[in-house]
């Protein structure tokens, strides 16, 4: 239905918190929670928590970020669905140039984060990392985010990573920025 399409579109466009989805769709929060629950059960959306979130935090409906699980679905609802009239009218070139091309690097960066996590999971299974991690995901607090954090069971060893899908080369400045984020994580 149009309600579900609006919710999926909102999430695909980067509105990943419950309140952001509510603001974008203007759906009453109590009803929105039911729709989101249905989309989670169908596997269309998933809910992501900071890698350091405990079970109590994960049980809180207000916590976590929603994400479209399938990259094709995510692309469709981010670029095709909101522009379907123009595309049906034959303006694929204009939509690509003025909509898709402008957002493609940002969109692809989220997909690249998933690819990087998959790569680390594979390396972990093959025991090719300095330690075996038991948990991997993104870490965030109210002001900062780390794209990848992997920790061992004892939480004594950690891998941090920033996933940059961009034209420019990663440099020392990027490394120092990640090191500063590591110190933020150590405070929590």
Per-segment meaning from a language model:
Residues 1-73:
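Interdomain hinge/linker elements that couple catalytic modules in large macromolecular machines
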